[in-house]
């Protein structure tokens, strides 16, 4: 099982909990989601609680993260979009830290499960819908009626816009899930080659050099993907929130 590339994604019950026939067990996935929130919160607290005139390296990282998300939100949704900053920043930090924790050996990557990423995507789309209807009422439906469309084409265009909107949580969740899943499987496969070849003696160890080099390179690539996927998730969230703020644009 140690060399099985799929085994790392297996969810196991740590504390079985069953209420009324429903399974509410505390799993390894639950544990690492809690660990993700705790790690992100601890990092931000420790790096900003004692700010100095000359920022430390970790304080600079926190401030850069803050400004990065704030700039992203302002560019995508304007100054009014800053009311969603706590929401977008929390999502960005959760996805980023979850991705980074998953790179450690024997750690669990929560973002490699479609259930987790789809729940995050539904949270985003749910926020767009709730705020859009709360702020604009039925005027929010103008989002599905682009300006300047000929009347004869309007029903078809509206249908396409509705389908496109409903597909957003699917594309948002699958993008993150698929990238993390594929990357970790590939990394595990090459790491398995290194272990298997190394067990064959001197000749095997010589043959393990190439897979080892690939493993190191893939680890660096996965580190980049961890940041990139957090960025993509956050920037798409900003774009969707812009629709809630300005449905007629």
Swiss-Prot record:
Predominant subcellular localization, coarse grouping: membrane
Membrane topology value: Multi-pass membrane protein
Domain of life: Bacteria
Alphabetical list of Pfam families matching this protein: ATP-synt_A (PF00119)
Location in or out of the cell: Cell inner membrane
Keyword Heme: no
GO molecular function: proton-transporting ATP synthase activity, rotational mechanism
Keywords from the named record: ATP synthesis, Cell inner membrane, Cell membrane, CF(0), Hydrogen ion transport, Ion transport, Membrane, Transmembrane, Transmembrane helix, Transport
GO cellular component: plasma membrane; proton-transporting ATP synthase complex
Record InterPro entries: ATP_synth_F0_asu (IPR000568), ATP_synth_F0_asu_AS (IPR023011), ATP_synth_F0_asu_bact/mt (IPR045083), F0_ATP_A_sf (IPR035908)
Transmembrane segments: 26-46, 84-104, 114-134, 143-163, 185-205, 208-228
SUPFAM superfamilies: F1F0 ATP synthase subunit A (SSF81336)
Protein family per UniProt: Belongs to the ATPase A chain family.
Quaternary state and interactors: F-type ATPases have 2 components, CF(1) - the catalytic core - and CF(0) - the membrane proton channel. CF(1) has five subunits: alpha(3), beta(3), gamma(1), delta(1), epsilon(1). CF(0) has three main subunits: a(1), b(2) and c(9-12). The alpha and beta chains form an alternating ring which encloses part of the gamma chain. CF(1) is attached to CF(0) by a central stalk formed by the gamma and epsilon chains, while a peripheral stalk is formed by the delta and b chains.
Function recorded in the entry: Key component of the proton channel; it plays a direct role in the translocation of protons across the membrane.
Protein name per Swiss-Prot or TrEMBL: ATP synthase subunit a
Organism of derivation: Chelativorans sp. (strain BNC1)
Gene responsible for this protein: atpB
């Amino acid at each position: 099982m140690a060399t099985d590339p799929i085994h790392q994604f297996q969810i196991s019950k740590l504390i079985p909990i069953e209420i009324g026939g429903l399974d509410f067990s505390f799993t390894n996935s639950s544990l690492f989601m809690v660990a993700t929130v705790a790690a992100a919160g601890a990092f931000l607290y420790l790096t900003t609680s004692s700010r100095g005139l000359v920022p430390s390296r970790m304080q600079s990282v926190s401030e850069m993260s803050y400004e990065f998300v704030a700039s992203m939100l302002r560019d995508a949704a304007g100054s009014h979009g800053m009311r969603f900053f706590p929401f977008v920043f929390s999502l960005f930090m959760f996805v980023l830290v979850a991705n980074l924790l998953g790179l450690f050996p024997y750690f669990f990557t929560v973002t490699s499960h479609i259930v987790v990423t789809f729940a995050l995507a539904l949270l985003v789309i749910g926020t767009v819908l709730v705020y859009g209807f709360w702020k604009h009422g039925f005027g929010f439906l103008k989002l599905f009626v682009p300006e300047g469309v000929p009347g004869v084409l309007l029903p078809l265009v509206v249908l396409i816009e509705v389908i496109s909107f409903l597909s957003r949580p699917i594309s948002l969740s699958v993008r993150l899930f698929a990238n993390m899943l594929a990357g970790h499987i590939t990394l595990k496969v090459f790491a398995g080659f290194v272990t298997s070849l190394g067990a064959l003696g001197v000749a095997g160890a010589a043959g393990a050099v190439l897979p080892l080099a690939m493993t190191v390179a893939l680890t660096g690539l996965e580190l980049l993907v961890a940041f990139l996927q957090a960025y993509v998730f956050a920037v798409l969230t900003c774009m969707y929130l812009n629709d809630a703020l300005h449905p007629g644009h």
